[in-house]
Amino acid sequence: VERRIPEDLEILDVEPIVVTNPYTGAQATLEPDAVAVYDWIKGSEVIGHSKDMETGLEWFRKHEPAAYRLLLD
């Protein structure tokens, strides 16, 4: 399955990044494309862009289901 990220997102990282769930402390190592989507989800949550947030969550459920359960569920 090709991992296309939502349009207009920029991948800034070049190495995988360990991301921590701020509520549970659970951690997941994300590839750079997933970090970009994760950051977009969290930013969309802060500014109330629920449509963008849901698009990002759908991407995570499809491409990173284990990380989704640890970080976003």
Indicate where each model-derived feature is located:
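N-terminal acidic leader/helix
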Residues: 1-42
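Short linear sequence elements within intrinsically disordered, low-complexity coil regions
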Residues: 28, 43-45, 65, 73
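Alpha-helical structural motif
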Residues: 33, 52-53
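Charged, low-complexity interaction regions
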Residues: 46-50
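Short, compact, well-ordered microdomains
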Residues: 54-73
